[in-house]
């Protein structure tokens, strides 16, 4: 992901992404550069300009994963809370989950 982000930064800066430019961005960010990963990135994008890569990426993001809102999915209705009595304090005691969905973008 870091290599792709570096590629995007070079492309968005108005330049044509090159291996040396991507490596320079990675080094500036303190990321150890693996030349084989840079080569694999450019092999994947061979023959495509930056705009084409962005357009293809956006089309793949359209069908993203959705999940119900945790507050509406787990919150009991007023009638259910009144009838269950003891269940309401147990539900209130639950801890909230971290909503980062495990992406760890900058780990």
Swiss-Prot record:
| Transmembrane regions listed in the UniProt entry | none
Cross-referenced CDD domains: Ribosomal_P2
Q: Which domain of life is it from?
A: Eukaryota
**Which Gene Ontology MF annotations are present?**
structural constituent of ribosome
Renumbered residue ranges of the record's region Disordered: 85-107
* Keywords linked to the UniProt accession: Phosphoprotein, Ribonucleoprotein, Ribosomal protein
Task: Recount the PTM note.
Answer: Phosphorylated.
Coiled-coil stretches are none
GO BP terms: namely: cytoplasmic translational elongation
> InterPro entries under this entry?
P1/P2_N_sf, Ribosomal_P1/P2, Ribosomal_P1/P2_euk, Ribosomal_P2
Which GO CC annotations does the UniProt entry carry? Answer: cytosolic large ribosomal subunit
Q: How does it assemble?
A: P1 and P2 exist as dimers at the large ribosomal subunit.
Q: Give the UniProt family note.
A: Belongs to the eukaryotic ribosomal protein P1/P2 family.
Q: What does this protein do?
A: Plays an important role in the elongation step of protein synthesis.
- Which protein, by its recorded name, is this? Large ribosomal subunit protein P2-A
